Amino acid sequence: MDNLDQLVQQAQADFAGVSDSAQLEQAKARYLGKSGALTEQLKGLGKLPPEEKREAGAAINRAKTAIEAALEARRNALREAALLAQLAAEALDVTLPGRGAQGGGLHPVSRTLERIEMLFRSIGFIVADGPEIETDWHNFTALNTPENHPARSMHDTFYLEGRDDVLLRTHTSPVQIRTMLAHVKRHAEAAAMPEIRVIIPGRVYRVDSDATHSPMFHQVEGLWVGEKVSFADLKGVIADFLRKFFETEDLQVRFRPSFFPFTEPSAEIDVAFMSGPLKGRWLEIAGCGMVHPNVLRFGGVDPERYTGFAFGMGPDRLTMLRYGVNDLRLFFEGDLRFLSQFR
């Protein structure tokens, strides 16, 4: 009995001295394992006389119960200590300032499109829209582009697979036709047709990619049709827009004679970089001209009574000029390090 009491006390002391569960399991094995001290006591019961066996067995069971109780108590203490340590490590300092939500921002090209729309709305234009998947008729035929024109080639235009009459629009000009047809139909009973004055922002697609071109890019089409609309009106509108867009009177702008099948006469508009490595270079930002009589006819407008001008400008390139960016592709790579500068 004395030996069993000492064994229990020794086990309790060993359990109390361990610092983790692995050490506790090792201590348990020394007393309750297959070769443990208490197990050896149980094995020795068979050698005792029958009259002593019952009393010795009861004493060993009491000792085993005491050791198991000490083991479980220490196991619970270690679990609680581990939990407290984890809570302390993961504790939140409620006195620290909270993390504010990081604000997003518009894409720089979206900013430019909004600015263009705002400036043209201020002089009486409205915003129109149309499909990006267009018919060959709206994209080419109705815009006075003959069947053998190079722009119709698959090297320049994305056609839908299996269809040679459906394509991704190469410009926003098809919306001119849709707008004129709808406008003429709406005012068919009027003695005089009200003016058409619209801008058409949207994505367009061409087979092209370099520092100043992208296979997908944005374009803003402008159309003004009415009685006695002239090229002087076109130059005045464009010059006024550019001065307001760049917020300066000191702007290098030039109109170059050009050719487009849907306008006559036609011109291209160039603006010079004002800073950066490309300073002094001229960059084309728009094509423009007086709407060709054939295009007016396709739109249902009488070219003998009405004239109009149209322009198509690249807001992507205007964004390059406004922010001093030299590679158009940077706008579409999705690099937040670049885009976050424009918030």
From Swiss-Prot:
<dbReference type="InterPro" id="IPR010978">
    <property type="entry name" value="tRNA-bd_arm"/>
</dbReference>
<comment type="subunit">
    <text>Tetramer of two alpha and two beta subunits.</text>
</comment>
<keyword id="KW-0436">Ligase</keyword>
<dbReference type="InterPro" id="IPR006195">
    <property type="entry name" value="aa-tRNA-synth_II"/>
</dbReference>
<keyword id="KW-0067">ATP-binding</keyword>
<dbReference type="GO" id="GO:0005737">
    <property type="term" value="C:cytoplasm"/>
</dbReference>
<keyword id="KW-0648">Protein biosynthesis</keyword>
<dbReference type="Pfam" id="PF02912">
    <property type="entry name" value="Phe_tRNA-synt_N"/>
</dbReference>
<keyword id="KW-0963">Cytoplasm</keyword>
<dbReference type="GO" id="GO:0000049">
    <property type="term" value="F:tRNA binding"/>
</dbReference>
<protein>
    <recommendedName>
        <fullName>Phenylalanine--tRNA ligase alpha subunit</fullName>
        <ecNumber>6.1.1.20</ecNumber>
    </recommendedName>
</protein>
<dbReference type="GO" id="GO:0005524">
    <property type="term" value="F:ATP binding"/>
</dbReference>
<dbReference type="InterPro" id="IPR004188">
    <property type="entry name" value="Phe-tRNA_ligase_II_N"/>
</dbReference>
<comment type="similarity">
    <text>Belongs to the class-II aminoacyl-tRNA synthetase family. Phe-tRNA synthetase alpha subunit type 1 subfamily.</text>
</comment>
<dbReference type="InterPro" id="IPR002319">
    <property type="entry name" value="Phenylalanyl-tRNA_Synthase"/>
</dbReference>
<keyword id="KW-0460">Magnesium</keyword>
<dbReference type="GO" id="GO:0004826">
    <property type="term" value="F:phenylalanine-tRNA ligase activity"/>
</dbReference>
<dbReference type="InterPro" id="IPR004529">
    <property type="entry name" value="Phe-tRNA-synth_IIc_asu"/>
</dbReference>
<dbReference type="InterPro" id="IPR045864">
    <property type="entry name" value="aa-tRNA-synth_II/BPL/LPL"/>
</dbReference>
<keyword id="KW-0479">Metal-binding</keyword>
<keyword id="KW-0030">Aminoacyl-tRNA synthetase</keyword>
<dbReference type="InterPro" id="IPR022911">
    <property type="entry name" value="Phe_tRNA_ligase_alpha1_bac"/>
</dbReference>
<dbReference type="GO" id="GO:0000287">
    <property type="term" value="F:magnesium ion binding"/>
</dbReference>
<dbReference type="GO" id="GO:0006432">
    <property type="term" value="P:phenylalanyl-tRNA aminoacylation"/>
</dbReference>
<keyword id="KW-0547">Nucleotide-binding</keyword>
<dbReference type="Pfam" id="PF01409">
    <property type="entry name" value="tRNA-synt_2d"/>
</dbReference>
<feature type="binding site">
    <location>
        <position position="264"/>
    </location>
    <ligand>
        <name>Mg(2+)</name>
    </ligand>
</feature>
